[in-house]
Amino acid sequence: RLSLHGGHWQLSGSKFYTTGALYADWVDVSANNPDEQRVSVTVRTNDPGVEIIDDWNGFGQTLTASGTAHFREVPVDPLNVILAENRFRYSPAFFQSVHTATLTGIGRALAEETAGHVARRTRSFSSGNAPRVAHDPQVLQVVGNLRSAAYAAGAIAAQNFQALERAHQAHLNDDEHALSHAVNIAELEVAQSQTIVSDLIIKASGDLFDALSASATLKPLGLDRFWRNARTLSSHNPRIYKSRIVGDFAVNGTPPPAQWRIGVA
């Protein structure tokens, strides 16, 4: 909450999912002002009263520092407070598109790493199709599917950013009608993308083991990290809700929500 004390603004409260805050110099915090308006507040991570705790213990995205942050009467410069409605309107879609891009990166990394393991592998199965696994057509098919999944995810992510660019241009042109339309379309494109890209990369992160052997499950290789990271990212904003929102727009013309928030009942 943002409150006024002795003529000076102060920020107080706690939140979880402070992704990246541990590595940042500044953080952007959503809060309510005394008029119960939603505002965006920017503070330094080393300001008095700011405490970032490294307590994220999820099984994936382990280095994202997505843990707890406490703000205890943190002094706030009035210049660093803006109404949420005055931020760039396509910000939710912009931030969500980062998840799609990250999933794409996971897909590319797992495809490349799997191909490398297959190329170097010397052991084979008696029921295989070639003396070397690198020449086994069934194994090559698996690797090809992994690479194709990563490519498809990347193409979808690029399409997302084109929609965001159109929203950005409408924002620069100060065209309210065009902006509202472009923001809604960007939100929908990102929502549609997340459901498909999540499916592609989560599946690929399990399928990669079909191209390898039981030794691929050894902990030092860490190949399970691709699934853990993809699954964690895809759980951040449940894709079942994204599909419902897209369907509601397709059937009823209902625009997507302007903000994504997590709260308690």
Model-assigned labels for residue ranges:
Residues 1-22:
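Glycine-rich flavin
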Residues 17-21, 95-98, 233:
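Glycine-rich phosphate/pyrophosphate-binding beta-alpha loops
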Residues 17-51:
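A short core secondary-structure module
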Residues 58-154:
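Glycine-rich beta->alpha junctions and the first turn(s) of the following alpha-helix
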Residues 106, 113, 145, 149-152, ...:
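Charged, amphipathic alpha-helical oligomerization/scaffolding segments
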Residues 112, 116-119, 155-158, 162, ...:
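Charged/polar positions within long, soluble alpha-helices
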Residues 152-196, 206-214:
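C-terminal helix-coil-helix/basic helical segment that borders enzyme active sites and/or dimer interfaces
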Residues 210-265:
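Glycine-rich phosphate/cofactor-binding loops in nucleotide/flavin-utilizing enzymes
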